[in-house]
């Protein structure tokens, strides 16, 4: 994390690898999710890897991403086999990762067993990156301490030295600067190897220093719940608070606490307040620009784009049991531009599925309407009269996620509804845009109900786009 970490951002990226409870179902590669508030994180690329490491055994765990003063992104991560190396790569755009290699950070320390969960902070005073990680030396993993090195160019490094040793086993450190002080969240793992001497379960605690390099002193009375690890700080400018994220690795979930001053922390936020991708583990969170977020959404969440202007219904899915526009979903967005020559009657803009499981958007007697249905349960919303315009291009979008259905016109939300609906099940009806292709989600099946006008730039996304996203697209 940069020492100047309080930035005016409204977009955040999370990098993570995946596994189930207790290290099962492992997918040890780089994954992405994004958030607007730091609480609800939506997976990109359908929760599949966005980048795969080729060093060592091809394993990427505990990714940490940070931006340098030149705007370039740097990625460090845990690799296998165990030993004196960590993984490294750099990127201009968070999409193409280059210069992949191992960094021999513990090569000069005898009997190094492992080098785990590396992170770094940029030291603006010395124009250097401070890289820190946990290593154990000897015969096993029972004496992990934190070591560090410095670099200006990621090519040459200062001799490795001890960074933090509280006298017991620690891993998973993360640093942040707040009002001239440096705070460290770090996992106390002493119980794992010495349960009789340290009977309290593993958890994360906080320490503070006046200098980036330390020494750090423990802040009494602040810790995350039992059986947590992988702490990570993020400043969320919209609420002027720090969020501390941590991983219940054995239970397959995340927890979040928050503070405005790094001294007084909330209790753990309720699970209803947060959302994380399924099986996400040991994440890194970083603020990004609107331009960067939109590029990532277009790369990893855009399912299909139909740019050509059309004046009649376009079928994009046949009547069949599998394939595009037939798969179950919990999140989806459809965005299009249309020019209507009339707004009377029924004119279907988008038609997926049927009246049992489906999603649809239409013009109905001057109103813009949308509906989602799952196993026959329906959620229908409509905008107000006098919003639609004739003979000029407009942007319409419908978004769905976590039971919330939103309808947008020219980047402004005109209707929103919520129902106890999450999964829209597989559906085998034909579908498309600019008209109806069977019995639609509204329950109507009388003819094509074609748009009287033109449609162009139809885009379907695998995430529930938000108002800020759509405004960037207008």
What are the residue ranges of the model-derived segments?
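Short strand-turn-strand beta-turns centered on an Asx-Gly dipeptide
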Residues: 408-411, 416
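Short, aromatic/His-centered strand-loop micro-motif at the edge of beta-sheets
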Residues: 370-395
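Flexible glycan-contacting loops in extracellular carbohydrate-active proteins
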Residues: 417-454
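Carbohydrate-active catalytic/glycan-binding domains of CAZyme proteins
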Residues: 1-308
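Extracellular glycan-recognition modules
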Residues: 311-371, 378, 404-405, 445-449, ...
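Beta-strand-rich interaction surfaces with strong enrichment in secreted/lumenal proteins
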Residues: 220-221, 273, 321-325, 382-387
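Localized edge beta-strand/strand-to-loop motifs within extracellular or lumenal beta-rich domains
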Residues: 392-406
